[in-house]
A protein has these predicted regions:
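Cytosolic juxtamembrane N-terminal segment immediately preceding the first transmembrane helix
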Residues: 2-35, 39-42
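Extracytoplasmic
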Residues: 29-55, 59-61
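Helical-face signature of the major facilitator-like transporter fold
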Residues: 33-37, 41, 72, 132-140
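Small-residue-rich segments within alpha-helical transmembrane domains of MFS-like 12-TM solute carriers
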Residues: 41, 45, 128, 140-148
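Central cavity-lining transmembrane alpha-helices of secondary-active solute carriers
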Residues: 69-84
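C-terminal ends and interior cores of transmembrane alpha-helices
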Residues: 100-125
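Cytoplasmic helix-loop-helix junction between adjacent transmembrane helices
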Residues: 135-173
Protein backbone atom coordinates (compact mmCIF):
# COMPACT_ATOMS: atom_id res chain seq x y z
CA UNK A 1 0.00 0.00 0.00
CA UNK A 2 2.63 2.44 -1.09
CA UNK A 3 0.07 5.01 -2.21
CA UNK A 4 -0.98 5.43 1.45
CA UNK A 5 2.56 6.20 2.61
CA UNK A 6 2.87 9.47 4.49
CA UNK A 7 4.42 12.40 2.66
CA UNK A 8 8.09 13.18 3.31
CA UNK A 9 8.94 15.62 6.06
CA UNK A 10 9.40 19.19 4.88
CA UNK A 11 12.22 21.39 6.11
CA UNK A 12 11.27 23.65 8.98
CA UNK A 13 10.53 27.26 8.08
CA UNK A 14 10.26 30.24 10.39
CA UNK A 15 9.11 33.82 10.24
CA UNK A 16 5.82 35.67 9.92
CA UNK A 17 4.96 34.01 6.59
CA UNK A 18 5.48 30.56 8.09
CA UNK A 19 3.29 31.46 11.09
CA UNK A 20 0.47 32.67 8.83
CA UNK A 21 0.75 29.55 6.66
CA UNK A 22 0.76 27.31 9.76
CA UNK A 23 -2.43 28.92 11.11
CA UNK A 24 -4.14 28.57 7.73
CA UNK A 25 -3.11 24.93 7.38
CA UNK A 26 -4.30 24.15 10.91
CA UNK A 27 -7.71 25.57 10.06
CA UNK A 28 -7.79 23.49 6.86
CA UNK A 29 -6.77 20.32 8.69
CA UNK A 30 -9.41 20.86 11.36
CA UNK A 31 -12.13 21.63 8.81
CA UNK A 32 -11.20 18.59 6.74
CA UNK A 33 -11.26 16.30 9.77
CA UNK A 34 -14.58 17.75 10.95
CA UNK A 35 -16.36 17.51 7.59
CA UNK A 36 -14.79 14.13 6.79
CA UNK A 37 -15.88 12.55 10.05
CA UNK A 38 -19.36 14.09 9.81
CA UNK A 39 -19.65 12.54 6.34
CA UNK A 40 -18.78 9.12 7.82
CA UNK A 41 -21.70 9.47 10.20
CA UNK A 42 -24.08 10.49 7.44
CA UNK A 43 -23.09 7.42 5.42
CA UNK A 44 -23.12 4.94 8.30
CA UNK A 45 -26.50 5.96 9.69
CA UNK A 46 -28.46 5.59 6.44
CA UNK A 47 -29.35 1.95 7.04
CA UNK A 48 -31.21 2.78 10.25
CA UNK A 49 -33.46 5.15 8.29
CA UNK A 50 -34.30 2.41 5.76
CA UNK A 51 -35.42 -0.12 8.38
CA UNK A 52 -39.07 1.03 8.52
CA UNK A 53 -39.34 0.78 4.71
CA UNK A 54 -38.00 -2.79 4.72
CA UNK A 55 -41.06 -3.95 6.66
CA UNK A 56 -43.07 -3.91 3.41
CA UNK A 57 -40.91 -6.86 2.29
CA UNK A 58 -41.66 -8.86 5.43
CA UNK A 59 -38.36 -8.05 7.12
CA UNK A 60 -38.86 -7.02 10.73
CA UNK A 61 -36.59 -5.09 13.07
CA UNK A 62 -35.43 -8.13 15.00
CA UNK A 63 -34.22 -9.81 11.80
CA UNK A 64 -32.36 -6.67 10.82
CA UNK A 65 -30.67 -6.69 14.21
CA UNK A 66 -28.27 -9.26 12.75
CA UNK A 67 -27.16 -6.82 10.06
CA UNK A 68 -26.87 -3.95 12.52
CA UNK A 69 -24.88 -6.13 14.90
CA UNK A 70 -22.38 -6.97 12.16
CA UNK A 71 -21.80 -3.26 11.65
CA UNK A 72 -20.99 -2.75 15.31
CA UNK A 73 -18.60 -5.71 15.44
CA UNK A 74 -16.75 -4.65 12.29
CA UNK A 75 -16.61 -1.01 13.35
CA UNK A 76 -15.07 -1.88 16.72
CA UNK A 77 -12.52 -4.25 15.19
CA UNK A 78 -11.56 -1.87 12.42
CA UNK A 79 -11.28 1.12 14.72
CA UNK A 80 -8.89 -0.84 16.92
CA UNK A 81 -6.88 -2.53 14.15
CA UNK A 82 -6.66 0.37 11.75
CA UNK A 83 -5.07 2.71 14.28
CA UNK A 84 -1.68 1.15 13.61
CA UNK A 85 -2.21 1.22 9.83
CA UNK A 86 -3.42 4.81 9.98
CA UNK A 87 -0.38 5.88 11.99
CA UNK A 88 1.83 4.78 9.09
CA UNK A 89 -0.39 6.27 6.37
CA UNK A 90 -1.13 9.63 4.84
CA UNK A 91 -4.27 10.86 6.62
CA UNK A 92 -5.15 12.95 3.55
CA UNK A 93 -5.59 9.71 1.61
CA UNK A 94 -6.62 7.29 4.36
CA UNK A 95 -9.67 9.25 5.58
CA UNK A 96 -11.27 9.78 2.14
CA UNK A 97 -10.41 6.25 0.99
CA UNK A 98 -12.36 4.82 3.91
CA UNK A 99 -15.22 7.21 3.26
CA UNK A 100 -15.45 6.24 -0.42
CA UNK A 101 -15.32 2.50 0.38
CA UNK A 102 -17.91 2.94 3.15
CA UNK A 103 -20.16 4.87 0.75
CA UNK A 104 -19.88 2.19 -1.93
CA UNK A 105 -20.77 -0.55 0.56
CA UNK A 106 -23.74 1.48 1.82
CA UNK A 107 -24.93 2.20 -1.73
CA UNK A 108 -24.94 -1.56 -2.37
CA UNK A 109 -27.39 -2.06 0.51
CA UNK A 110 -30.28 -1.54 -1.93
CA UNK A 111 -29.09 -4.47 -4.05
CA UNK A 112 -30.46 -7.34 -1.90
CA UNK A 113 -33.99 -5.95 -1.89
CA UNK A 114 -34.12 -5.00 -5.57
CA UNK A 115 -31.90 -7.71 -7.07
CA UNK A 116 -33.59 -10.52 -5.15
CA UNK A 117 -37.02 -8.99 -5.93
CA UNK A 118 -38.34 -9.49 -2.42
CA UNK A 119 -41.68 -7.98 -3.38
CA UNK A 120 -42.39 -11.06 -5.53
CA UNK A 121 -40.14 -13.65 -3.86
CA UNK A 122 -40.52 -13.41 -0.07
CA UNK A 123 -38.79 -16.80 0.30
CA UNK A 124 -35.50 -15.00 -0.47
CA UNK A 125 -35.79 -12.88 2.66
CA UNK A 126 -33.10 -14.69 4.69
CA UNK A 127 -30.65 -14.47 1.79
CA UNK A 128 -31.32 -10.73 1.58
CA UNK A 129 -30.73 -10.35 5.32
CA UNK A 130 -27.47 -12.28 5.01
CA UNK A 131 -26.28 -10.07 2.15
CA UNK A 132 -27.29 -6.96 4.11
CA UNK A 133 -25.37 -8.27 7.13
CA UNK A 134 -22.27 -8.78 4.98
CA UNK A 135 -22.58 -5.34 3.42
CA UNK A 136 -23.22 -3.77 6.80
CA UNK A 137 -20.08 -5.49 8.08
CA UNK A 138 -18.19 -3.78 5.25
CA UNK A 139 -19.82 -0.44 6.10
CA UNK A 140 -18.63 -0.84 9.68
CA UNK A 141 -15.19 -2.05 8.58
CA UNK A 142 -14.59 0.88 6.25
CA UNK A 143 -16.39 3.24 8.64
CA UNK A 144 -13.74 2.48 11.24
CA UNK A 145 -11.20 4.20 9.01
CA UNK A 146 -12.48 7.64 10.07
CA UNK A 147 -11.37 8.11 13.64
CA UNK A 148 -7.70 7.01 13.52
CA UNK A 149 -6.50 9.61 10.99
CA UNK A 150 -8.59 12.34 12.62
CA UNK A 151 -7.18 11.59 16.05
CA UNK A 152 -3.67 11.54 14.67
CA UNK A 153 -3.86 14.85 12.81
CA UNK A 154 -5.37 16.53 15.86
CA UNK A 155 -2.40 15.50 17.97
CA UNK A 156 0.07 16.57 15.27
CA UNK A 157 -1.44 19.97 14.54
CA UNK A 158 -2.60 21.15 17.97
CA UNK A 159 -0.64 21.55 21.21
CA UNK A 160 -1.63 19.75 24.40
CA UNK A 161 -3.16 22.98 25.70
CA UNK A 162 -5.32 23.38 22.59
CA UNK A 163 -6.23 19.75 22.06
CA UNK A 164 -9.06 19.54 24.58
CA UNK A 165 -10.86 22.50 23.06
CA UNK A 166 -10.29 21.42 19.47
CA UNK A 167 -11.30 17.82 20.14
CA UNK A 168 -14.50 18.89 21.89
CA UNK A 169 -15.41 21.08 18.91
CA UNK A 170 -14.44 18.27 16.53
CA UNK A 171 -16.68 15.86 18.48
CA UNK A 172 -19.66 17.89 17.28
CA UNK A 173 -19.10 16.05 13.97
CA UNK A 174 -20.71 13.04 15.65
Amino acid sequence: MNFLSPPPFLPETTGPEADARYKRLRAQVFTGAFIGYAAYYLVRKNFAMAIPMLSQFGIDKSELGIALGMNAVAYALRKFLMGSVSDRSDARKFLPLGLVLCSIAMACMAVPVTWLDLAHHPERKMLAIGIMAGLNFLVGWFGGMGWPPCGRVMTHWFSQNERGTMMSIWNCAH
